[in-house]
Amino acid sequence: MKFYDAHAHCIKNQAGGILLGMEGKPFFESTLSNQQVEAISKEDNRFFPAYYVGSNFGKVPDERILKYHPRREKYSADEVIADLSHRACKLCIIDTLNQPFWQPLDYWKVVAANPDKYFILPHVGGYDIIDFLKILDFNKNVYVDFSMTQEYFGWCGTRSRLAIVADGIDYCLNSEKLSKRVLFGSDEPFFSQKLALQKYTTYACAEDVLVNNYQELIAKIQ
């Protein structure tokens, strides 16, 4: 089945998608650096590079898609807002598994300060899923993916199921409004692309989540 993976650190079976550079510490085997995602995207136009922004807010090869990771880099929401103000960024990806460094309101603050940019909030906050679904509901420039969260909290796979999180995923996927801004993300190689894909194919919104929503978002930032 054709699908795009909007949150992967390596290539598996996706027809294309966003490849996220991983820089800084700790280093993880089988993940791609900024230099590697740049090289892949130049050779294969099915993949778009998301360049990792470090705490020094240094230059990256292309500012169109940027990835911020507050938990690893310890920058504040105000610092990210300031950095985005002089970047030619069209799509901003901000890791949401950041307790205790950021709270959900910090993400809302960054989104509100950048109405001209699109955002992907990957992992949809983990334990804080309800707050991030609220951000999704009230901000038309926000997309989410459930990478990591979908498997870690037992929505798919064999781990124990945490109802508030798994039910939140189901609620979002069954919402005609919200499901239009959900992207498939796996977080490979940390979590299974295959397990998640199998579960998504059972939902009425599968074609949108696996293909259409991604294609529409990419068209908006071209």
Predicted features along the sequence, with ranges:
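Mid-to-C-terminal alpha-helical segments outside catalytic/metal-binding sites
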Residues: M1-A6, Y171, E176-R181, F191-Q222
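An N-terminally biased module of ancient metal coordination in phosphate/nucleic-acid-related enzymes
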Residues: M1-K42
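Hydrophobic faces of well-ordered beta-strands that scaffold small-molecule active sites
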Residues: F3-A8, G17-L20, F48-Y51, R64-Y68, ...
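Conserved, mostly hydrophobic/aromatic
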Residues: H7, V37-S41, H123, V144, ...
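Active-site beta-loop-alpha junctions enriched in small/polar residues
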Residues: H9, M22-K25, Y52-N56, H69-R71, ...
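Short, well-ordered alpha-helical microsegments
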Residues: I11, N34, F57-G58, Q103-P104, ...
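Active-site gating/metal-coordination segments in enzymes
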Residues: T31-F101, K140
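Catalytic pocket-lining loop regions of alpha/beta-barrel enzymes
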Residues: Y75-L183
